[in-house]
Amino acid sequence: MLLYFLITCLSFFFFTKSLSLPPWASETKTLLSFYFIKNPFMNTLHQTKHDPASPVIDQMSVLDLPELALDCILDLLPPSGLCSMARVCSSLRERCVSDHLWEKHLKTKWGKILGPAAHREWQCYISSSTYHLDSPHHQTGNLGFAKIISLIRSLSSVFREDKQRRGYASSLPLDSSMSCYLSLETGRFWFPAQVYNRENGHVGFMLSCYDAELSYDTHTDTFQARYPPHGRRASAIEKGVTWDRIRAAPIDASPHLLHVSDSLKELKPGDHIEIQWRRNKEFPYGWWYGLVRHLESCDGDHNHCHCHLSETVVLEFNQYTVGSRWRRTMIMRDHKEEGNEEDGFYGGIRKLNCKEEIAMWKRHWPCSILE
């Protein structure tokens, strides 16, 4: 009986030693190493020396992981890591180009400066003749930035097996989150947003925010801004616009349209506001930061102040020196658009209730008072 048991065990042992994983299983071995090296959490774990005589460990594949574990790994990868993973096999490629992974990267990097207008512009962009992705390298132009080059090269390998290759169109939906991310990252997609202190902080635009079309420059991690024409004045272009000077438009409307204010009746001294202003009727509106102040007839004592009951509202722009014609203006609570060709035209008002919005304006305060 004992002899029979020993023979059975030895037979089973030699049989299992003769088994090996199929060749495709080792394709992703290096990707596991990439993940464990790049993941700072995994670096805190004690490294275990593998037995070189064990072929099972050497041939371990990422595809052998449970679904949940694999999803967690992919969810932690940066865009370049997802592209590397997508090169391994068709199964991983399908996972790595999925919207749920790239939507997170879109939201994290671009979410704060992409508004409804940018999403509409993206839909127009992908349906236009300018959206050509005949080659992943065509997106890079002369970028030369190592991260983007690496990312695009990875994508080139992902789709190189397509015989009828027409860029991503044959394998990746044009409206996918991955396509949007790459078009933004490579600067091919110009999206609408607003820029604080336009034209490099030109004195005539201090504490203002104007609509523009923006393109990302991966060399400098800044943007190029293209402002709409002001009357007969040609479109202005500004380079080197930093992330902190950009915001998504708070009002989803054309800069030529008057904003219908819904907070005029509740304005009181001390409120922070943005007001539309334009030099003349041919120009688009910009948004300007200001404060609501007390009437001249009021001593400023909050216990006796009745300014909030008056039909006249005093607006103050403290970036201008006392006595400047731009320092103060008065509007009516039934205000629509007021002004003239000399002082410009004041349009709609937004009351700022968000502390983050107010703090953003204060961060762009000029170094010195303007005349």
Swiss-Prot record:
InterPro entries: F-box-like_dom_sf (IPR036047), F-box_dom (IPR001810)
Protein name: F-box protein At2g32560
F-box domain segment(s): 59-105
